[in-house]
Amino acid sequence: MTKNQAGVMTSATAGLNLSDSVYERLLRERIIFLGTQVDDDIANKLCAQILLLSAEDPTRDISLYINSPGGSVTAGMAIYDTMQFAECDIRTVGMGLAASMGQFLLTAGTKGKRYALPHARIMMHQPSAGIGGSAADIAIMAEQFAHTKRELNELQALHTGKSVEQVTADADRDRWFTAQEALEYGFIDHVISHANQANGIGG
């Protein structure tokens, strides 16, 4: 490598750490990654990435890889709505752990294009609520929590083909699934061990 080449590389990567560089390269391949707890910051980032990629080419799939313990329901619903809003198909791939809101987003991928790696673990449960304050506040929050729980169960039923009643019963406590069990339940459509099994993951 010449001194000039080294200078160009240094300039091009200034301000970027290795992690940033990897995620930018993945984004260019229409691959986005949810690898943390779901919060407002990560939701805003993922929503922006989905909107950008959908606007760039609405005919090519986006691949969303998920390794997440879950998190905020409102942040997760922002990602969910953006996934449904996008014109292009959203492939979802569960790896490691897809729990709670992570499981919900995995299941929200385009039907037929929802995958899990063989040793992924998937967990479904009802949303949690920290309710406190005055009696009036508690009543309002309890009503909102009941609405959120009902809405999530209805959407889970829509994406899995299960009845709302079954989803409600199954989600009452933490329920864990292997990749194969998640396939049988309807959370995903395929268990894959190699990228080429997903028929061109990454668009």
From Swiss-Prot:
Its main location: cytoplasm. SUPFAM superfamilies: ClpP/crotonase (SSF52096). Keywords: Cytoplasm, Hydrolase, Protease, Serine protease. The keyword Membrane does not apply. CDD domains: S14_ClpP_2. Its EC number is 3.4.21.92. It is an enzyme of class 3 (hydrolase). The active site is at residues 100, 125. It is found in: Cytoplasm. It catalyses: Hydrolysis of proteins to small peptides in the presence of ATP and magnesium. alpha-casein is the usual test substrate. In the absence of ATP, only oligopeptides shorter than five residues are hydrolyzed (such as succinyl-Leu-Tyr-|-NHMec, and Leu-Tyr-Leu-|-Tyr-Trp, in which cleavage of the -Tyr-|-Leu- and -Tyr-|-Trp bonds also occurs). One of its GO terms (molecular function) is serine-type endopeptidase activity. One of its GO terms (cellular component) is endopeptidase Clp complex. Disulfide bonds: none annotated. One of its GO terms (biological process) is protein quality control for misfolded or incompletely synthesized proteins. It comes from the Bacteria. Fourteen ClpP subunits assemble into 2 heptameric rings which stack back to back to give a disk-like structure with a central cavity, resembling the structure of eukaryotic proteasomes. Cleaves peptides in various proteins in a process that requires ATP hydrolysis. Has a chymotrypsin-like activity. Plays a major role in the degradation of misfolded proteins. Belongs to the peptidase S14 family. This is ATP-dependent Clp protease proteolytic subunit 2. It comes from Nocardia farcinica (strain IFM 10152). The gene is clpP2.
